[in-house]
Amino acid sequence: MSSLFDAVTVVDNNTVTENGMPAYKSTLSKVLDLFTDGFSYRRNPKGVEHAVREAALENKELTLRCLFYLRDIHEGQGERAVFRHGMRTLLGLYPEFKRNLIFIPAGHDADSGKPYGRWDDLVALLGVNKEVDEEIYSIIRAQLAIDMAMLEDGMINKISLLAKWLPSANTSSKKTRETAKKLYQNLGLKDERSYRKVLSALRAATNVVEIKISNKDYSFDYSKLPSRAIHKYRKAFERNDNARFTAYHDTLHKVLVRGEKCIADVKINTAGLYPYDVVKPILRVGNSISETSKLQLDNQWRSLRNYFEGTSGNHSWLAVVDTSGSMFDVWGTDNQVASIEVAISLGLYVAERNNGIFKNQMITFSQRPTFITVDDKWSLYDKVKHIANANWAMNTDLEAVFNLVLNAAVKANIPAEEMPEAIVIISDMQFDQCTYNRDCLGMIRGKYEAAGYKCPKLVFWNASARANCSKPITRDKTGTILVGGCKPGMFEQVLAAKSPESFMTDILNGERYSVLN
C-alpha cells in the first residue's frame, strides 16, 4: 500500500463507541481485525467474506492461519460457520491453499489427536472450484478406503469419524441428498445403495450416538461419549436412562470434588465445549433446572481444560465483566448465546482457574462496579446465581471500575505487589464517555499514574455479538492485548506478548499453525 493510503487509513480511523467514548474503526491491521472479530460474524457468517479479502491483501498466509485458528476446536475458537465462509473465499482467491485441506480433519500431526475441525468441513467447502473439489474428493476417497480396510480387519478403534460426518443419501433435505449424490459419484462408489451400505457399516462400527438414540438404545458408556453429544442429549439421557445417568454423575462428582478413587475410569469429555455452554442453562432455566442437570453441569465445568496450567508462577489475574444492557445481544440466528453468557462464563473461568491473589474474585460493572467472591466448595449453579444477583444496569461505565479500585488501593496503602498483574476486561467494548473525553487506554493509564501505581497488562476480551464494532486500541499499543471469542486459553502468551499484534503473530506463527501455508 502507498504511503498516502497508509496515512489516510490512520487519519480516518477515529470513531466513538455507541456510548460516546473515543475509539477506533480498526486495529490498523486487517488480519488482527479478523483475529479478534472473526467470531462475531457468527450472526451473519457470510459477512466474513469481505474481512477475509481485506486481510488476504495484507498477508494471505497469516489470513489462512487465522481462519484455522478461528476453526480450531482444541486450541482456537471453534467457529465452524465463520471458518467455512471465510475459507471458501480464501480458496476462491488462492486455490493453491487446497494443500492445507487435509489438516482440517487430521491436524498437522497425525499422532496428536487434535484436528482443527471435522470431516463435514471439507464437504462444506465443495463447489468453490474444480481444483478444490478434486482435492476434497481425493482426501475423502483415501480415508474411506483406509476405514473400510480397518473394518474388514476388525480394527474398529482405527476407523475415523468420516462416515459419521458424511451426508446421508436418504435424508429429507434435498440439498443434503444432492451433496451425497455428488460424493458417491466422485468417490468410486457404484450407486446410492453402495454409498448407503458403506456409511451404515462404518457408522455401526463406530457406535454413532445418534443412531443408538434413534433405536432407543441407551447402553452407553457415558465416559466415552463426545463432549457435545453428552451435553446436547443430556435431557434424553436423564429422561430415558435416569438411574444409570445419575449414578454416573454421582460417581464422577466424587472423583472430581473429593478426589475419591473408583475402579472404572470415570470422566466426562469437554474438549468441544465452550464455558458458556455450561453456564447458559443455569442463567436461562434458573430455578427449574433438575438436580441431575445441576450435577452434570458442575462436572462439566470442573472438567474443562485448565489453560492456566501452562503459565509459570502464581500471576495475579483479575477479570472485569461487563453486565450492561448491550451485553444481552444474541450471537447467531438461532438464539445460540448472548454476550452476557459469554462474559460471565469467561469471567468466572479466569477467577477460578488462576492461582494468584485474586483467585475466586472478579468485578462486574454496568452503572456501578460490584466486587464478587465465590467459593471453590460451591456448585457451579450457586456460583452463577451469586454472580447474577450483582447490580446489572444499562450503563457501561468502565471508568467507575478504576475509580473504585484505585481509590481503595490508595486509601488502604496497598503495596504494588498486591495489585493485579493482568486485568481481563470482558465486554462488547461500547464503553461510556469518561472524564476529559479520553479513550479507554488513556483513561486507565492516566488513573494508574495519578494513583502512583504501574499500569497492569490490559487484556481487552471482545465479547460483542456484532461484527465491525469499534476497537478500544490499535495494533501497536504496548502493554495491551486484544482477544475475541468464547474459548479461554493462551494465557502464557498474554503475559509474554508486548502488543495486540505481537500476541496474534506469536500464536499464528507458533507450532500449531506454522505448518499452514
Question: PLM features: residue spans?
Answer:
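Long lumenal/extracellular ectodomains of secretory and single-pass membrane proteins
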Residues: 1-342, 352-517
